[in-house]
């Protein structure tokens, strides 16, 4: 078996993470032997690690997801510290989503999009079709009422979607994915947060050099000073890291 179709797992504070070496490893793993895996993809960064610690419902949601991967550089560094031989790299959720969409377009995999503002969702659909000829079999913006959820799940099931991406922020998107899987289990689900906004140019992502240096968090802070409280909260994670409480 090709080594890229399997991946080791690592545990941080009780949370089991998949250790992908790079983006190609992630894609080969998810499309092992030409078959797209089924389950839920969840990106893990330091902020989400803190939320998991503090919120039992979120912890249960995240633990239930099959594919938890290191989206944040802090998490990658913690894995490498705890497991010095680990060959694990950051796989940014926004980049993984684009690669999945490109692969879906190439193979004709049916995709259902959930979340985002109506105009952003429409632009996302148009760009995906134009750029990669993605077979989008349905979509729903993020502005639906609780009583409309079941009808949405039935639509997703009827569409035959094999990839469902949900852009509603955490933990809303994890709740939606969990509940939708009860109706439509035969798909790969991915929570993508604000990815549609970035993809369509409504939100500017950090330049590549900032990402490479692991300073995307600093770029966002400089761009949005209001994030300072969120960033200060991460000092708790740094304490875990530097005291080895992982």
Curated annotation (Swiss-Prot):
Protein name per Swiss-Prot or TrEMBL: UDP-N-acetyl-D-mannosaminuronic acid transferase
Keywords, comma-separated and alphabetical: Glycosyltransferase, Transferase
This protein's record includes keyword Nucleotide-binding: no
CDD domains assigned: Glyco_transf_WecG_TagA
Naturally occurring in which organism (per UniProt): Escherichia coli (strain K12)
Gene: wecG
Known role: Catalyzes the synthesis of Und-PP-GlcNAc-ManNAcA (Lipid II), the second lipid-linked intermediate involved in enterobacterial common antigen (ECA) synthesis.
EC class (word): transferase
Catalytic activity: UDP-N-acetyl-alpha-D-mannosaminouronate + N-acetyl-alpha-D-glucosaminyl-di-trans,octa-cis-undecaprenyl diphosphate = beta-D-ManNAcA-(1->4)-alpha-D-GlcNAc-di-trans,octa-cis-undecaprenyl diphosphate + UDP + H(+)
Pfam families: Glyco_tran_WecG
GO molecular-function term, one example from the UniProt record: hexosyltransferase activity
Superkingdom to which the source organism belongs: Bacteria
EC number of the protein: 2.4.1.180
């Amino acid at each position: 078996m090709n080594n890229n179709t399997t991946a080791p797992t690592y545990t941080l504070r009780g949370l089991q993470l998949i250790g992908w070496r790079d983006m190609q490893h992630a894609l080969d793993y998810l499309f092992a032997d030409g078959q797209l895996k089924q389950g839920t993809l969840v990106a893990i960064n330091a902020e989400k690690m803190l939320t998991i610690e503090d919120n039992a419902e979120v912890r249960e949601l995240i633990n239930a997801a099959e594919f938890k991967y290191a989206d944040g550089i802090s998490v990658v560094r913690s894995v490498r510290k705890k497991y010095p031989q680990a060959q694990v790299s950051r796989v940014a959720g926004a980049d993984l989503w684009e690669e999945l969409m490109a692969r879906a377009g190439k193979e004709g995999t049916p995709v259902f999009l959930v979340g985002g503002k109506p105009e952003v969702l429409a632009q996302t659909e148009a760009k995906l079709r134009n750029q990669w000829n993605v077979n989008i079999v349905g979509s729903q913006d993020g502005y639906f009422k609780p009583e409309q959820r079941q009808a949405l799940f039935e639509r997703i099931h009827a569409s035959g979607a094999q990839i469902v991406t949900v852009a509603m922020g955490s933990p809303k998107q994890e709740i939606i994915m969990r509940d939708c899987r009860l109706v439509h289990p035969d798909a790969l689900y991915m929570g993508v947060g604000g990815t549609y906004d970035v993809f369509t140019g409504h939100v500017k992502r950090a330049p590549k050099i900032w990402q490479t240096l692991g300073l995307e968090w600093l770029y966002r802070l400089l761009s949005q000073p209001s994030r300072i409280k969120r960033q200060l909260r991460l000092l708790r994670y740094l304490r875990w890291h530097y005291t080895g409480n992982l």
